[in-house]
UniProtKB/Swiss-Prot annotation:
Keywords: Ribonucleoprotein, Ribosomal protein, RNA-binding, rRNA-binding
Summary of subunit composition and partner proteins: Part of the 50S ribosomal subunit.
Job description of the protein: This protein binds specifically to 23S rRNA; its binding is stimulated by other ribosomal proteins, e.g. L4, L17, and L20. It is important during the early stages of 50S assembly. It makes multiple contacts with different domains of the 23S rRNA in the assembled 50S subunit and ribosome.
Biological process, per Gene Ontology: translation
Protein name per the record: Large ribosomal subunit protein uL22
Cellular component, GO annotation: cytosolic large ribosomal subunit
Pfam families in UniProt: Ribosomal_L22
Region of interest: Disordered: 102-122
GO MF terms, alphabetically ordered: rRNA binding; structural constituent of ribosome
Protein family (similarity comment): Belongs to the universal ribosomal protein uL22 family.
Amino acid sequence: MSKALLRFVRLSPTKARLIARQIQGMNAELAIASLEFTPNKAARVLSKVVASAVANGSLDAKSTLIVSCRVDAGPVLRRSIPRAKGRATAIRKPTSHVFVEVAEGKEMKSSKSHKKNQAEGK
């Protein structure tokens, strides 16, 4: 099992979590391939972090699963923009911490019905 962590990336955690939920439990090679064709800044960042996690463990991407993919909120950079009549309004520039954990395994993301059957003990 290997991990990769990218901290203080200028990316909204809310938007990044949408992509992170999609790749959790996927094969690493398939996840990287699908992220490359996703037109989103978060997809580019997550693709690099997944590739880094695979490289950190000296693993083969074809036989590696993404065990967990977590995006936490980092500090918010506060900026101001001038407005009419001498006022200024705040601009929030959020940052994120991206954490990816991968492990050897060949099982793909299982379906909801399969998970339900496992929970019931069938």
